[in-house]
A protein has these predicted regions:
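Beta-strand/loop-alpha-helix module characteristic of Rossmann-like adenine-cofactor folds
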Residues: 2-7, 107-167
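Class I S-adenosyl-L-methionine
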Residues: 1-103, 107-108, 129-130
């Protein structure tokens, strides 16, 4: 049985990693995450670490995972909140998954502006179609927290809203 340790991290260059996570990382051999995650954590990895970039198509990534029994994955924020842990559970239902979440970007925003988080309708456009976003607009949701990516940026989202008559 494969074991995945999925560690949620922030975008902060000076990562806070608990002693438990630092110990896990120091003993790890195989690590994975996006290119940005690698940039953020490479200083913590052992010298002989193997890194598997999470890139699309994901089938190639999961083929590489098959070669290893334990993989430490770095993911953004809460790995279950529209995150990579969901993908691992879907693709490898028999895998053992141990999570170390941190705050996600929408939680951080809510905390910064003192907004009760449950009042925000949340959705992800990260590698996803516009459907959930369009539905939220059609429903008239007042507060929409959107996870973005390199293609569906805040500017792209604003342009789409203007195109459909929101100003």
């Amino acid at each position: 049985m494969q074991t995945f340790y999925i560690i949620g991290i922030s975008d902060n260059r000076n990562q806070f990693l608990s002693p438990e996570i630092r110990n896990l990382v120091s003993q790890g051999k195989v690590f994975s995450g996006g290119k940005r995650h690698h940039e953020l954590v490479h200083a913590y990895l052992p010298e002989d670490a193997v890194w598997i970039d999470i890139t699309v198509p994901l089938d190639a990534v999961f083929c590489r995972y098959e070669e290893h029994s334990e993989i430490i994955v770095f993911a953004s924020g809460d790995p279950l909140f529209f995150g990579f842990a969901n993908t691992v559970m879907r693709k490898l239902p028999s895998a053992k998954i141990i999570l170390f979440p941190t705050f996600n970007s929408l939680q951080m925003l809510a905390h910064r502006i003192l907004l009760p988080y449950q009042e925000m309708q949340t959705l992800s456009l990260t590698g996803r179609p516009w459907d959930a976003f369009d539905s939220a607009l059609i429903r008239g949701d007042k507060l929409i927290g959107v996870l973005t990516d390199r293609e569906k940026t805040p500017a792209t989202i604003a342009a789409r809203m203007l195109e459909y008559g929101y100003d």
